[in-house]
Curated annotation (Swiss-Prot):
Role according to the record: mRNA-binding protein which stimulates mRNA decapping.
Subcellular location: Cytoplasm
Primary site of residence: cytoplasm
Biased segments, Basic residues type: 57-67
UniProt source species: Eremothecium gossypii (strain ATCC 10895 / CBS 109.51 / FGSC 9923 / NRRL Y-1056)
Family: Belongs to the EDC family.
GO molecular function: RNA binding
Sorted UniProt keywords: Cytoplasm, mRNA processing, Nonsense-mediated mRNA decay, RNA-binding
Name the UniProt record assigns to this protein: Enhancer of mRNA-decapping protein 1
Ranges of biased composition (kind: Low complexity): 123-142
Stretches for region Disordered: 1-146, 210-230, 301-330
Amino acid sequence: MSSDTMFINSARLLPTENRKVKQLQRPDRKKHTRGSYAAQKQQLPNGEQPNFGHGQKQSRKRGSGRQKGRDGAAGDSANVGLTEDLKQLLSIPSGSAGSESAQKETSAGQPATGAVADRKRSVPAGGPAGKSSSEPASASSAVDGMPGLGFQSAHVPFSSPVVNHPMLAEPAATGPVLSVPFPGHVAGYMPCVNNTRVQYPLQTRNNVPMSQPMSQPMSQPMSQPMSQPMSQPISPYLPQGFQMHPQSFVGLPVAPMYPQYMSAQYQSPKQQSACQMPLRAQPPLIPSITRNALPCVSSANSTAKASVRSKGSPGSEGGSRRSQNWKSSQNVGYAGATFATDQPALSSLPKPSFV
């Protein structure tokens, strides 16, 4: 800023009687003090003061609208309605204590009369109402065997896209090898890795000893429809990563198209619970082929690269010609600029001793 511009600005701002031409200074410097001045209070466009969580007492004194709605009669009624809704949502109907005790008794192996009576009242017609709690339920009521969903399904109809899936109600049986038991995977069963493919008859599944008492109501409904191999239609849905044999629909024995450890993962829940420690899986065949084939390819590539390098070695004439042509073509694009590589006397200097 030049001196004349500063004079014009100061003359326009200063009053005429207090004008000092020799000692020009800005008028705002007089008003400033060396101490810190109080900042102006912020105000929102709607007229309220901003509340960042530190001014609760001040906002109560002013009586802002936000605190009125929170502590007033309207806020109390809204809170009462919310608590009533939560009570209705979380309330357990009458007889739930009996159903919980009945679930504990059935897990211990004792018959329960209160749970049977409650289920007879709550289950609609056509369902397994006449069966006792010790008898296995059908595949449609397989949710009752899940841990944590048994006493709720006795009073509230439980509907879920996972449970009502067609694959859960009608499992597919393909020849001597069974497909995946989906309710077992929904309940949290993990497949046990085994290196032998299971091709036993279907009736021998019931003789496998059980190690977990809670998985019995889940696996019993699945054993009934699977006892007849081709009685139910095969569902078109297949689990992810499951490969179907082309001739398994006819029932012919076919060699496995994938490594054996893949087929052993899809077993019944009883067989999975019976094996305590996962056995060592057989390594797949495809990586072994690639291990044998990769060194040959790499050796061929290395020999080819060596031959190319031998052709273009700097000692031969062809290699020197190519390098000279490449240098000349690279140096053409620069307008008269010289580099150290253009002068061999500078580029081939002896290296210092400390390097």
